[in-house]
Amino acid sequence: MQPPLFVISVYLLWLKYCDSAPTWKETDATDGNLKSLPEVGEADVEGEVKKALIGIKQMKIMMERREEEHAKLMKALKKCKEEKQEAQKLMNEVQERLEEEEKLCQASSIGSWDGCRPCLESNCIRFYTACQPGWSSVKSMMKQFLKKIYRFLSSQSEDVKDPPAIEQLTKEDLQVVHIENLFSQLAVDAKSLFNMSFYIFKQMQQEFDQAFQLYFMSDVDLMEPYPPALSKEITKKEELGQRWGIPNVFQLFHNFSLSVYGRVQQIIMKTLNAIEDSWEPHKELDQRGMTSEMLPEQNGEMCEEFVKNLSGCLKFRKRCQKCHNYLSEECPDVPELHIEFLEALKLVNVSNQQYDQIVQMTQYHLEDTIYLMEKMQEQFGWVSQLASHNPVTEDIFNSTKAVPKIHGGDSSKQDEIMVDSSSILPSSNFTVQNPPEEGAESSNVIYYMAAKVLQHLKGCFETW
């Protein structure tokens, strides 16, 4: 019985695989679909290339606009740098004059101050002792106050900050040069990408409609008949002048030169003579000492005013001959130059802040441009790679053939499309399976196959 069983088993297996093999009708349907693959595929390729060329055109337009914005930024940066250098130069000149005046004043003021200080200290301490008993505390306060006056007149103020270091300017210059180099290279890359895409356009120009040809070859300043690609990422920018509102530092120089000396004179007169003006009711005080009119119980308001402000001691300078006009005539230029130097330093700080802000805006503008360019190149740049392979759309879809394959007896899911890509790609051939839900005779298969082939080709170009 064993031989008959063996024969029956072989026969049943043969029938099974015979039933699963493709019929002539199904094979003819697959071959018929493949004959229409070049026509459908070429239409898809033309549409995808057209979309990519529109994206490349938009990228070129965007880059040209970005170049204009970058040029305005660099112009503003150059102007701000010149203004900053002028502010630095002005501050250096004031500092040199201040140092010269301090050296001259220091030599002459020491002797005069040594003669003025004892008399001024004596009168002031007597007054403050009468107003506020406590010799040690009053004497300590007086020494600190007089020491501040001497330090202000004989040496540079400790509050004056050093001018900005030259190394900082050099570092900023290097940063600007780096930004300029990156942006220039980005512009070159964008132009190169467009040139390669333009070569593809010339190859396929006859396949495109007249409106698209006019658009792609038109000047970028004309109206655009096609909506911009990546419209969500490219937003309208405000005018640079309205957006930043950079003040004119040269105008600040002019205003500074007109007002600083007037303010300095007012500050000096206020500091040295304000108390003297309020002293008119008490001119009857003589140089021999304090009278009963200055006692706390009779002049409480005056004592309270002087205790709150030790600069009231300067009122007694008229009691001493050597102190009479010391602060206003001995070294009049030193206080004025100190204030002028502080004003110049403030101007330098303002110009440095403006320069830093424009550098930051330029850096942000560069980073934003790089981001947009990368996004657009990622989406549309694949078309430029066709230029180095001399593609012909017919070759892509003519080099195809059906490969029958057995799939567990389901003849409607057996076919695959093999694409010979050696004519346009260095990679080996690849196959595309029929969609699971469609049979070989379905008309939807050809569109599915064409889309898969095009997707594969685009993926290969995008990785290069």
UniProtKB/Swiss-Prot annotation:
The keyword Disulfide bond applies. Pfam families: Clusterin. Keywords: Coiled coil, Disulfide bond, Glycoprotein, Secreted, Signal. Disulfide bonds join C105-C331, C116-C323, C119-C320, C124-C313, C131-C303. InterPro entries: Clusterin-like (IPR000753), Clusterin_C (IPR016015), Clusterin_N (IPR016014). Residues 56-109 form a coiled coil. Its main location: secreted. GO terms for molecular function: misfolded protein binding. Residues 1-20 form the signal peptide. PANTHER family: CLUSTERIN (PTHR10970), CLUSTERIN-LIKE PROTEIN 1 (PTHR10970:SF2). Belongs to the clusterin family. This is Clusterin-like protein 1. The gene is Clul1.
